[in-house]
Amino acid sequence: ILQRLLGGDRCKARVLVISPTRELAEQTHKAFEMLGKAAGYRSMSVFGGVSTKSQIKTLKTRLPEILVACPGRLLDLMGQRVVDLSGIEILVLDEADQMFDMGFLPSIKKIIASLPREHQTLLFSATLPQEIRALAKQFQRDPVRIEIGASRPAETVSHFISPVSQGDKYEALRTVLGGIEEGQTLIFTRTKHRAKKLALQLTNAGFNSTSLQGNLSQGQRE
């Protein structure tokens, strides 16, 4: 994508990446920022959960060549007429199946409808449900489908299952954590409430623990 940008216009958005979450948007933005630094290309991430004022100021000062955005905030800024997408040459729909699951498909169609007729669309998706195939058929001409084999767990990762009752889960987890000598541990829970409660329990038990869940503000996430 960066190679395609060489020799073209500056100070206008030429690449638009649509991401389902703010974390993925920020991660993608930082990757573009690092890779495009030598060529002088600017990247910007746009997502909700933070004030629009700083985003609008940046967009009005100098529009970055690469714009990484979540659908909701991008539509908001488009409605305020502070985003010019008339120069977009490449559109990337990242984690398209996840965006469909989150209900973003109508928003994505609105965004695509505002883009120039001549642009390339790249669609990245772990799965290809009917809705995503229909989207590709509607907005892509003569698409090339590239499939990558399923990733395998690292050989250094061990797997085991411990059947325990609900009431014994915490003590079983403490036993497992107590056997880990160093490094970080990532624990997945079913709900946001459970993540917050478990992090507090582990902190009280002497572990350096924190929760990462949907109720956190952007500042807390960072």
Regions found by a protein language model. Give the residues of each.
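Conserved helicase RecA-like core
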Residues: 1-222
